[in-house]
Each structure stands twice: as structure tokens, then as C-alpha cells.
Swiss-Prot record:
Biased amino acid composition, Pro residues: 77-91
Residue ranges, annotated region (Disordered): 71-100
Domain of life: Eukaryota
The name this protein goes by in its record: Uncharacterized protein ZK688.1
Amino acid sequence: MLLCILCILYFFTTVTQQCAPHSPSPWTKTTHVNNHHHHQTVENFYLDNRTIYHKIIEIEKRIERIEEKENNVLPEPSKPNNPVVNPPVSPIQPKTDPEQSENDCLSCPSLIPILDSCENCVSVKISPPFEYYSCKAVELKCGDGAKKLKISDGFQKNIHENNFKLICKNGSWMMMANHAEHKVETITCLTN
């Protein structure tokens, strides 16, 4: 009895699988009686290539239209000529001697206060006017034997480099050191 039931079940499942209706393929939207997977793959590939081909044709047509529009650019209308306008003339200012003017930052004495006994200090060059905080600067060189540069009685600077820059500001020679300005009274190169 059990053997009969198993045979019936086996026969029933085999027949229903072979005779089941085929549904449309989701890729090709067609029914395939034989349901060959290779056929589906080839047809899908064909449809994808056709779609890509049509998209390429559309893009090429768009590019051609854009190129035609660029070639058919209308010329710009001519601009009217503007009349020539003379630039405004600035009033002539009288020249003054900068050493005599107290408000001018170039009013420092032209000679730097170097002591006569300091033979190894030599003025190197005078720079053009600075744009930010000073108008004139002078660089000095001291001899190789100097250890310190005496700026004033209250300030001495150790010599690490051989160049020092003095700045003319508010009528006095100043030296920037340690983010502070020091008024230069005399310059002496000290060997000790």
C-alpha cells in the first residue's frame, strides 16, 4: 500500500512539472515553449545592444545640433565709440625737504648715530621706502669680532647675524628686536 502511494506521488509530480504552462520571460516578454536559458541570454544581449545603439544615435544627433548652433552664432552688435575723457589732473604739491618736515617719516637724520670709535660698523645700503610700518631702512654690518651691538644704554643685542636693519620712524632711528621697537641712540659694536 505504501509502495502504491509513493508511486502515485512520483508519477503525479513528474507529469505536472513537464506539463506546467510556461510564463512570459521577464527579459524578453515572450513565451518559450522549450525554455532554453541560452536563448534568453542571447536575446537579452541583442536587445541591450540595440538599446545602446539607439542611445548612441540620439547622442550623436544632439551633438550635431549643438555644433550647428555654435556655428550659427549671431555676431555681436557693434558698440558705440565712447568719447575720449581726459584723466583728472591732480593738483601740484610743493616739494619740501623731508629732513626738515617733522611729520614726515623720512625726517630722520641722514647719518646713522654710529660712534666714531666703532670702526667696524659700515653702512651697507639704504632701502627704498617700506609700505607697512616705516619709510627708510639702513642695513649695517659689524666686524667679525663683534659679540654684541649696543643700541642704547638700556638695550644691547647679541649678534647672531652680521646684518642689522634700522628703521626711520617718527623722526628717530628704530631697531626691531623681540617684537618691540627700540630707539637707537648710538650704535656700538662690542667685542665682549
